[in-house]
Structures are given as structure tokens and as C-alpha cells.
Amino acid sequence: MDESSRIASSSALHGLDEMVSAHKPSPPLPSRRKGKSALRSALEKKNRKSKSKPKVTITSDTPKVSSQHSPVSSAYTGDSTTDLDSKSGHSSSQKLSNKVSSALKLTIPKRWRSSKSSSSQCSSPFLPTSSSNGHGDDASLNLPDKKSRPSSQSSIFLSNWSTIFSSNASPTDSQLSPTHTSTIAELAASTLSIFPSGSYAGSTFGSPSRSSIDSSTYLPRSKSVNSLSSNFSARTPASNQSSVSEDFGAAPNCDHKHNSVTLSDFALPDIDQHDTVETILEKVEFTIPKQFTPAILSQGTSSLLKLCLRKYLSVVNFKCISLDMALRKFLAVYVLPNETQQIDRVLSTFSDQYFHCNPDLYDSSDECYILTFSLMILHTDFFNIHNRQKMTRAEFISNTNLPTILPEILECFYDNITYTPFVHVEHIGCVVTSPSNEKPSLSQRLGDSQFRLTKRNTFATESDHQALQEQLTGFRINLDSILDLKKIDSVRTSIESPTRTADDLYKEFARAPFLQIVSHRSQPQAFSYHFEPSAESESTNPAIINVKVFKLGILIQNEKVRKDRLLSNREVGVILTSSQLMFFKNVYWISGLLDQLEDFKRSHSFSPCYFSPHLTSLSADYIIPLSDLVAYGDGSRIENELYSFSVKQKNQRTHVFSVTNVDELNDWLVKINFVSTFATAGLAPRERLPCVESSDKSIKASVSVLPDIYEDSDAMSKASKETRSEVLECSKVRVYIVQNRIYKLEEALRQGESKMTVQRRNAANILHLEPIQSRTRIRLARCSNTLKKNMLAQMIEIQKFKISIKFLKEDLEMDSHLQDYLRSVFPSSVMGKENASEDTILESNFRNHSNPSVRRSNLRVGKTVESVQNTKLKSVENDSGKAETETVGKNPEVVRKSPAKLPNIANIMTVNGHRYSVVELPDDFLRE
């Protein structure tokens, strides 16, 4: 402390001591000298200790003062008359001292108190003077010592007193008047003028926040039960308040109670018949405040005002905001009308604008409207103090009744709405910042009801739209890593583009190698597609069964031994046949077969490849059926430079395999899915027909697979007329089966894509949600994990349906070419009847079809299809009297005349003593 400050402090304390002593009877001189010396020693000790905090004492004798001189004092001390008893006077003064001390936030040590009076000639206009009778009450402020008080306030307080008592101070005329009487309340009020004070204007909900100035400055709150600062600050001069308002950046006149306006103060301007949407909006924006504009525009029922309301709200940006937070943002700026119909118009327009900004979150604007209205009803129900039975979470989900939205999303809406009420921000000149970024004061941490730590309203006083936008999106959690939509979209059943066609795959299957199995207990024709035992066909020769191998190789299987361990990789041999995947742990045997196949390819031989030696049995370690099987992958490379793909069974069990290059990966995917498509439909991939002139005792002619004897193109022309006609009818049956399967797959694909669209909307909704409570975030994280699994399974099914439809349509196109081929082989005289009925197509009402498994069994054993035919014609018997032509299904190009009979396929497979499957092809049909 410098010399000037020391002199000022000494003079201030000296004057204070003289003023105090002027109101007390003079005690003996030794005691008076002792008090002065103690005061001086205390001041010198204070100056020597620079780290100690300066403290001030106030000791005065309060006379009997009329209430008209001190209204504040009379308000807090009760009656203006005081008791002459020293105890009662000291008690009343003690109560007043405690109240004043809480307002001043100061402490006074005992050693600075003095009960000695000095000469009555020493008086000050700033302290109360004695009455005419010379007696008064002792009003010493006996306060506890607080060592934790900041030194900045004490320094300011001390410097202010030094200024008051310095010779340079210029008191007012009223203060210099000898008849002016000051009280302790007035002294406290004049002392509090050094602290900043200001009025607030903010929200209708919540508590006022502190200003964004230095947090060390004390700002008294209004209506505080802990201090009297709000009452004393009211006596601060207007000039002082104006300066404080300027320091806080607020307007001088920002009293919310005096400047508030309501919706009833405004009305819809007059509208002429020549007014347009633009002119009406100009009138409304010129005469009506922004927060009341939607409510005013909703008062009219004309379509023109609805367009005005829609255009006015079209500038509001709701992109990437959840619906509940968008509703908060909307109600923070705009005021809803009072009538129900008008509220309905405003909320309907809000829903349209929200759906326009976020078309991927909901199915339609009507869905947004239902949710918005449900949220408003929930808010009204929950925060209504007269409603004892609050709406529960389960009741809210049940009342909303939107099955396409996940319950976890509705639960998040419920938690956010019930956590804190909606807030409307008044648009006035006061600039108030949010308290969320400031450290709470001591009174806030001690449990002030206006500043709760557990449920603090962060939307209460936010008037800046940009900051409000940041607050509304500050609770969003990152669920992208859990959902991982990119991985879901990368699921493919074929890596190459474009995928190989069915014609290309048929050519590869026609040249596929064979495994030969020798059986001594079976007849040669036992493994034919349609076998009827006869005495003539019995033979003692062993039967050789040819098993076509569509694909074989060595794969790395990835499997988990235990849940807590990493993947274990092991090599397995895999053989793909027409009906199953066969796995062998003996990879050396598979490696030998691969070597034989490579040698055969280098020989450029046109005959089929037969693996040697012949097998007495074919026992795989485990088998996976191809029915309802799908193979998929994403083409991504995993560790050790491998490409992985998965095979998913009908029972949802998944097997993961790895290959060394992407070409091998794509080859496995395409061939597995191709064979699985026909195995699921109850068909087999087409093969070449055996020679019709071969002997029945030929081993290779006894099986339905491709032998090493090629078909002669002239063989068909030698067949009888009835046989040729039956072959064409057989082809029609296959067309019917394939068409039926395509129709069912397309229906399943539409349903799967619809479910996938709903799941994508739910995923986007979860990513945009902003849960406030931690328990809501935990539920959303669990829901995201479950949703990811469902979306992945649905995407796999969609890809399976797509590739199956592709292969079946290509096979259907091949059937039409096959019929043309057969007609070209048969003589024209034989095909005359067929040509006459060429315009008659097979009736295909796919919805009323018989059991597929029963139908497949009937076709394979050669039974008649009368039951199938009756089932097919049952739905069209009632329509026989209708028009000749009608549209089939949803395709207007497919027209049928009279219901055509299904072909009778009994015994139609016999051609020169040979029985063939409906899935076989002539040899020269597959072009080289």
C-alpha cells in the first residue's frame, strides 16, 4: 500500500472514530486513550501484513429516528420508538446488524469496535447524529469474522469510504445540512451503490441468468431469500442504474413487466380481394411482431391465408433436428394461438415444413403431424398442476399408435418432453446469455431453487437463435459406429458387375466334371430322375452313379471356438453339387481332384471329365443343403490379404469362409446362389439330353445327368407325334413353375424393401435424436445394436431375392428359345396343331396355387397333375361367363382368352424307352 492510500485510510478511520465517539457519553480519559492506541496499532499491523485482508468496523449510537426520515429502517426495525433498556436496544440492533451484514457481505472484527464516546463536536453528515436529549441505542454491528471473503470487495469498500471521508469529496447539500439525519439503512444503501445492479428480461419459464461480464463481480438476484440486496438496490440512483445497464450491454429500459405484449393486442390486417400472398405477408410483418405472426395468420379459414402461413414458415430450418427439439425451437420463437382449430392449423403447417426439411425421417407429413400433436398433448398433460394422473410412457406409446416407429424413439420423445417444459423467448432489447457455460456461484451450489443442479433448464433465457440452435443439438450422441449403415449397404451376392448370365453359367455346368460312385446294391436306373422298376431292367451289373461337381476348392473357414476367443482359421475342402455343399477335412484329396481338373483343362478335350479312381461311397464331414441358402460378401479385404464371404442357411446359421483373390470370391458367390435359386424353387439347372438311341442297359444313359454320349439333332425328328407334343407340353409346365416362383419372389422383394425403408427411417431418426438423460442414451445404444442386426438380415434377404429373380427370368427367356428350337426340329406337319394353339398361353393365377412340395413330388414321380390343374382352374370357373379377354396380374400386356387346360404330363417323359426330367436340354441347344 502506497503512502497516499495509507494517509487516506488513516484519515477515514480517524473521522469514523470521531463520529462514533460523538454520540456516546464521555468515559474516563484512560479508557479513551486505550481505545485510540488499540485502533492505531491495529491499523499499523494491517499495513505491515500485505497479505492480510483489510476490514472495517461500523460502530454508532442510533437515536430515535422517525419513520419519515428512514423508510427502509422502519421497514426492517418495526416500531420507530426504541426501549431505553440497554438489553432490548442491543437485541433489536443486533437483528438489524445481521440483516445489514448479509446485504453488505462484510465482516467486522471485534478489536475494531469502540464503545467510548468522544467529543460531541466531532460529527459527520454521513452518520446518524444524536437526538436532542443526547441519548441513543447501541447499534453496533456484532458480526462473525469470515476469512474466506474475497479481498477485492473489501478493497473496493475501503476505497469508497476513503473517498467519502477525504477532503476532495463533495457531498450534496442535503448531506451537508445540519438537520439531515442518516440511518444505518441509508448507510447500507449508499454503500451498496458500489456494486453493479441491473434488471432482467428473459423467458416466461425458468430463472434469470447472470450476465456475461466478469464472474467475480457480485450481481444481486431479485426475490432472493438470502439477502436484502434487491430491496437496497432499489434506492440506487437512476444515473447509477443506467451506467450499470450499459456495462451489462442491456438497454436502459428493459423491464419485461411494463413492455410485454400479448396476442390479443394484435389483429389480422384488412385483406383486399386483389391481395396476394406476398402483399399479405408484407402487411402482417409490418404491423405484427414476429412471435405472433403464425397465430395471426391461422385466424382465417381461407386457402389464401393457409398459403401465407405455409410460405411464412417455409424459411424456418429444421434440417438435422429431431422432432421434439424442432418443436421446442418453434415454440421458443413463436406463440401458439388460443383456439383449438387455430392451433391445429399452426401445427399442421409446422409438420409440413418439418417433413419438407427431413423427408427421410418419416413416411409422410401426416405422420409428423400425429407425432407433433401427441407431443403437445403429453406436454399439456404432464405439466398441468391440476392433473394428478400423469400420462405414463406406455400410455404415450399406445396412444400414439404408429407401428412404423420404434418404441425406443417414442420413449426418447417422452423422456425429453417430460424433463423440462417448453420455453418461449421474449424478443426484447435486453441481451442475456445462457448460464450453461458459466460456473455456478456459491448460492447456486448450495441449492437455490432458481439454480438447480440436477434439472437445470438450459433453454430458459436464450434469445439468440444461433446459440439456441447449438443448445438444441448439443445432446446428440454418436451412433454411427454402432449402426454402420455403410457396411449394411455394401452387402452383395455378386462382386463383379455385370453379373454373369444364366446362359454363361449353363455352359460351365454342361462341362462340369463328374465324381463316379460304384454301387452293388442299386439298379442302374434307380438314380434316374423318374424310375419305375421293371423285370426287364434288372441287371446284375453294378450301378455307377455320376455326381456332377459344379465347383470344388479349398477354403479357409473362420469360426469362433468360444465367445471370448478370436476367430480360428482352418482349411476345408468344399464340393458344390446340384443340391448341397459338401465339406471335407481331408484337403489332400480335394487337392488331388484339383490337379486332375487342371490337367484335363490343359488337354483341351471335348469329352466330360471323370475323376479317378471310382468311389465306393461319398461321405462328407458335414453337409449344408442349398434350399433357401444365400452366399453374400462385401468384397472387402480382411487380415492376411484374404477376401471373406458368408453362407447363410435357412435356420439363420451363418458360415464364414475366406479366399485368396477376388475372382475366386465372385465365382463362389455366383455359383452357390445360382444353384440355390433352382434348388429353392424345386428345379434343377438345365442339362443336356442323353442320346435317345442309346440302350437302356447303358450305365451312363441310365442317369439323368449328362453322359459322355452327345445328342444327335436328328433324333428328335424320329420321335412319334405324340411324344413330340408331350415334350412341348413339358416345357410349358416348367414355364408355369418358373413364373409362379418369380411372382412369389417379387412379392417378397416388395415387402422386404418396404421393411427396409421403415428400418432406414428409424435408423435416421435414432441418429438425429438428442436424448437429455443418460438412461435414455443407454436404451438408444441397445436399440441401435438390435436395429443393425435386423437391417443386415433384411438386406441379405433383399439381395437373395434380387439375384434369384434375375436367374429365373433368364431361365424363363431360355424356355421360350427352347420351344422355338423344338418346333424347328419337329416336322411342320406334326406341329400343325401346336401352331393352331400358339396364341393360347398358360393361365397363371399365382395367388391360388397348391402346395409347392406336393406339386414337386407329383412332377418328379410322373403322376398326373389333375389336382394341380383343378386347383389352378378353381379360381377361374366362376369367371367363365365373363369377357373373353382379361388382364393377368398387374401386367396389362399378358392377356388370356378362355382358361387353358394344363398339360397332362403323365408318361410324357418317355422317349424311345428313356425317361427324362423336365429340366434337361438338347445337346446342340447350348451354343458354343
From Swiss-Prot:
SMART domains (UniProt xref): PH, Sec7
Gene Ontology cellular component annotations, sorted alphabetically: cell division site; cell tip; cytosol
GO biological process, one term: exocytosis
PH domain: residues covered: 548-677
Top-level taxon: Eukaryota
Main subcellular localisation: cytoplasm
Segments of skewed composition (Polar residues): 1-12, 57-83, 234-245
Region described as Disordered: spans on this chain: 1-152, 227-249
Record-listed Phosphoserine modification sites: 67
Protein name per its UniProtKB record: Arf guanine nucleotide exchange factor sec74
Originating species: Schizosaccharomyces pombe (strain 972 / ATCC 24843) (Fission yeast)
Organism phylogeny: Eukaryota, Fungi, Dikarya, Ascomycota, Taphrinomycotina
Gene designation: sec74
